[in-house]
Amino acid sequence: MNIFAKQQINNPLSHNKKQLSLKPKTNKKSMANKSGSKSAIKSFPKTFWTVIVMEFLERGSYYGVMSVLGVFLILSGAEGGLGFSKEQAGAILGTIPPLLYFLPIMAGAIADRYGYRKVLFFAFTCMILGYGFTGLSNSYAMIFLSLILMAVGAGFFKPVISGTIAKSTNQENSGLGFGIFYWSINLGAFLFPLILVPILKAESYSYIFYMASSIAFVLLLINLFIYREPVREKTNKSLVQVFSEMLLVLKDWRFILMIFLYSGFWILYFQMFGTVLWYVRDYLDMTPLNNAVNSFLSLFVENPSWKFDVEHVTVINAGVIILLQLIVSNIVKKAPALPTMMAGIGLGTLGMIILSFSASPWVFLIGIMTFTLGEMTTHPKYISYIGLIAPADKKALYLGYSFLYGVIGSSIGGFLGARLYVKYVDELGTPSTLWLILSGIGIFSMVALFLYNKFLVRKTN
């Protein structure tokens, strides 16, 4: 799920997947593996488990909000929403995620200079106020500003947590540590929209934001009384130096071109928080799926009344990742990075094409799951590919700025998706055209990366 966090941890996780997916050939090896896993678990300090809990709570509340935000913005007041236009909603969706991808670069330098706990205090204060005022506000300007404040908090939170994970693990247990970190993110993204969001929005959508604000307050207390800052190397790096490094990376046009081409896939991904949710609300009759799920649930409870709603799109995405990420990573672990990225983009694009086939709930499920398989295939390889093409003395710098795919994909995805939906769905009534146009972006990204691989990478090598 995950948007920024996925990028930060997929590289360590790809190493971890090899550890977790080993199948013992003998009982002795199995016993040794179990013993090693137990000792590795015990090797983590208290600070590690503290930030795992913090990450689970923060990402859970964030994805709980994002799972319904796109719909909350456009619902009428009578339906419990704010009544904004889809273009206005697209502007918000095209602004908030880019901040989450961009701010950690500056926040990391600030945290290294002034201290993790101080930055966390600032981050949680921003989240408390941002989520809280979003739930209280009705005007477009106040909602926009409140969500920007929330994004600032989330953007400053992220590098501190990943930095703490890195400093509270060692060479022997870092793979497992970042693997646990990754699962905590997706577990939060799975459970909060599945359990809390339906209960809260039945009362009021505002309660979802109050929940997120309350959790941010709990995180603030954890930071004050439980979290212990790990030993870190203090730095005097200024923000001017940070931006100077960014300019250095931006001069590598091949690197920037590759990121721009890869960003096409993320234009599709960020439709999961906008156009896909609107499509579920406006076009899909989920009754067959509801009946099937309730028929299964009736084996355990009397008269179940489960109902699929927009927040369950996030649940599907996170759930598929939880179930299949290790399997997918094990399958592609020896495959070359760039061709695997292209294959993953192809799978994601196929998911969008499937959405154009019909408004059947089963077709929709297959499309979203196929897209998620593409996401799981392409993104870990993207991180490893950055490590391959970066100059030997600048690998950390290049990996730090590989976030640009999220800035480009989310900003274009938010604004473009809203405009396309209004034209082809609201005005023309042809949602299939919307999905095919978006699929065209995925095809362009895949073909362009193929040409990049053939004509630029080989010449460079």
Positions of the model-derived regions?
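Intracellular loop-helix junctions on the cytosolic face of multi-pass helical membrane proteins
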Residues: M1-K6, N10-K46, N170-G175, L196-F273, ...
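Short amphipathic helix-loop junctions that connect adjacent transmembrane helices
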Residues: S67-Q88, G274-F308
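Central cavity-lining transmembrane alpha-helices of secondary-active solute carriers
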Residues: A91-A109, V315-I327
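Conserved MFS/SLC helix-loop-helix module at the cytosolic interface between two early adjacent transmembrane helices
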Residues: F102-N138
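C-terminal ends and interior cores of transmembrane alpha-helices
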Residues: T125-S139, G346-A359
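Intracellular juxtamembrane helix-capping segments at the cytosolic ends
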Residues: F156-N170, T377-P391
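Glycine-rich segments within core transmembrane alpha-helices of 12-TM secondary carriers
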Residues: G175-L200, I215-L219, S402-G414
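A membrane-interface helix-boundary motif in multi-pass transporters
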Residues: P198-S214, R419-I443
